[in-house]
């Protein structure tokens, strides 16, 4: 991490975390941070960051069409937190089902969480990778539809224990079809790294 502060604040921070809570400086980490900060000075990065947020906002609006509840009603950054309490699947099962469909998401807790962190009520999605690939609104419309389809397909197995649920998902021809469609979309937007 990088902390920006005045000298007085740095002294207080150092007294509160040294020794034991903070390691020494790692030059490779510092170099990486410097390169990353240098990248942010390019106009292309500003465009990329802006498009990443636009993509997240558009994905929110598309998911809301399928009655997915977005925590806080929307987003102003690259992340989306979906409250799944109105859906049959919660975070752990839904994230795993999406994984088999080729869509990476994280189970996540949310404000006023009533479930355990091991099986939370929410799902977190991010848009940096789809933005890096060059995807925009038309592709996000497809992604939102696939997310909804995965929920609809896998809801029938909600009452199963996790291992049995996972076996149903990974042997589902419908999920395999979505995974193939996701892969085809990604092939049309290859990563240039």
Where are the regions a protein language model picked out?
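Short secondary-structure junctions and interdomain/linker hinges
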Residues: 20, 24, 40, 44, ...
């Amino acid at each position: 991490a990088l902390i920006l502060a005045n000298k007085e604040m740095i002294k207080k921070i150092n007294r509160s975390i040294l020794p034991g809570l903070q390691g020494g400086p790692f030059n490779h980490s510092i170099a990486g941070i410097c390169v990353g900060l240098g990248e942010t000075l390019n106009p292309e990065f500003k465009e990329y960051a802006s498009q990443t947020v636009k993509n997240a906002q558009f994905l929110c609006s598309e998911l809301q069409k399928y009655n997915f509840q977005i925590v806080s009603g929307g987003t102003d950054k690259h992340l989306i937190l979906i409250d799944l309490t109105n859906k049959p699947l919660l975070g752990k099962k839904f994230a795993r089902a999406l994984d088999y469909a080729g869509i990476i998401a994280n189970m996540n807790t949310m404000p006023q969480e009533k479930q355990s962190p091991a099986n939370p009520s929410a799902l977190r999605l991010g848009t940096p990778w789809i933005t890096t690939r060059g995807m925009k609104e038309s592709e996000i419309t497809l992604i939102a539809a696939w997310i909804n389809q995965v929920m609809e397909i896998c809801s029938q197995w909600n009452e199963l224990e996790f291992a049995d649920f996972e076996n149903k998902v990974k042997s589902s021809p419908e999920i395999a079809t979505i995974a193939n469609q996701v892969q085809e979309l990604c092939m049309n937007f290859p990563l240039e790294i």
